[in-house]
């Protein structure tokens, strides 16, 4: 029988930060990707941003947040497909593009900009964030990072933890 451990977000982060730093130290200088997945409103964006802040407090400039919300299909495309009522479901994202982007980001030696999602306009925006070349830890957050079927399936294989 397994025991359930309940932790506050801060307690979870205090355990996670040393673990991530250990993984990064064993990566031989290559970028690593740490995934935080969860449903809408679960706190993954807040937790991910705090993880990046804490990692950068220990090793300045070492971590960057990579939100996957920018891989929603453009709203016009969702309307065209008649999927507005299903917006946010896995098939209303550009899953293959997210896999391609994350693969490129893990191997890039230059600054890379990524798309974001604006709640203000309810659509994606280009160049919402930039990952600097010196970043070694990508904190990837999104709803569907752990899916094993469909276009998102390739993301899980790119995550180191």
Language-model segment annotations:
Residues 1-33:
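Extreme N-terminal, non-catalytic leader segments
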Residues 38:
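The Walker A (P-loop) glycine that initiates the GxxxxGKT/S ATP-binding motif of P-loop NTPases
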Residues 41:
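Walker A (P-loop) phosphate-binding loop of P-loop NTPases
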Residues 44:
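Conserved lysine of the Walker
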Residues 47:
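Hydrophobic positions on the alpha1 helix immediately C-terminal to the Walker A/P-loop
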Residues 53-64:
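Post-Walker A helix-loop "phosphate-sensing" segment adjacent to the P-loop in P-loop NTPases
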Residues 64-67, 73-121:
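Conserved nucleotide-sensing/catalytic segment adjacent to the nucleotide-binding pocket
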Residues 124-161:
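ATP-dependent NMP and nucleoside kinases share a basic, alpha-helical "lid"
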């Amino acid at each position: 029988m397994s025991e359930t451990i309940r932790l506050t977000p801060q307690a979870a982060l205090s355990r996670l930060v040393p673990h991530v730093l250990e993984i990064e130290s064993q990566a031989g200088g290559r970028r690593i990707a740490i995934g935080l997945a969860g449903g809408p409103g679960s706190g993954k964006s807040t937790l991910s941003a705090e993880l990046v802040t804490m990692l950068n407090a220990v090793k300045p400039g070492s971590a960057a947040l990579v939100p996957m919300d920018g891989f929603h299909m453009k709203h016009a495309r969702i309307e065209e497909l008649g999927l507005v009522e299903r917006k946010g479901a896995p098939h209303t994202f550009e899953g293959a593009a997210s896999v391609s982007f994350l693969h490129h980001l893990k191997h890039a030696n230059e600054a890379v900009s990524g798309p974001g999602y604006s709640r203000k306009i309810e659509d994606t925006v280009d160049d919402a964030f930039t990952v600097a070349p010196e970043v070694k830890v990508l904190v990837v957050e999104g709803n569907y990072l752990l899916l094993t079927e469909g276009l998102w399936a390739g993301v899980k294989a790119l995550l180191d933890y």
